[in-house]
């Protein structure tokens, strides 16, 4: 899987950086949100707890997808702005079990 950053912009009103990316996955299945998140964290040298992959849109029959991610400046802003279901899909299973 290869990820290319298409656009990166600051959003000072919401204290976050917004990233549009393209994901190429020739001969592989569509990547999961957590796989993309981990790759973006490594590429952007970001804190894994502050990066949220909002969506991944796949073209029919194409080995590529476009996506939208956000990097927040603080965990408080992330929980204040993002809906709970988006936070949940960006959390690994082991972290969810620890919270219960």
Curated annotation (Swiss-Prot):
Any Gene Ontology CC annotation: ribonucleoprotein complex
Name of protein: Small ribosomal subunit protein eS24
Keyword Lipoprotein: no
HAMAP family: Ribosomal_eS24
Pfam families hit by this protein: Ribosomal_S24e
One of the GO biological process terms: translation
Molecular function, one GO term: structural constituent of ribosome
Designated gene of the protein: rps24e
Top-level taxonomic group: Archaea
Family label: Belongs to the eukaryotic ribosomal protein eS24 family.
InterPro entries in the cross-refs: Nucleotide-bd_a/b_plait_sf (IPR012677), Ribosomal_eS24 (IPR001976), Ribosomal_eS24_CS (IPR018098), Ribosomal_uL23/eL15/eS24_sf (IPR012678)
Keywords attached to this entry: Ribonucleoprotein, Ribosomal protein
């Amino acid at each position: 899987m290869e990820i290319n950053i298409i656009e990166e912009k600051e959003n000072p009103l919401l204290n976050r950086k917004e990233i549009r990316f393209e994901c190429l996955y020739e001969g592989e299945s569509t990547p999961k949100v957590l796989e993309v998140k981990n790759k973006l964290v490594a590429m952007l040298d970001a804190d894994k707890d502050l990066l949220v992959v909002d969506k991944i849109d796949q073209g029919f029959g194409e080995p590529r997808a476009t996506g939208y991610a956000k990097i927040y400046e603080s965990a408080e802003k992330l929980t204040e702005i993002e809906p709970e279901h988006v936070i949940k899909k960006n959390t690994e299973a082991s972290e969810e079990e620890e919270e219960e």
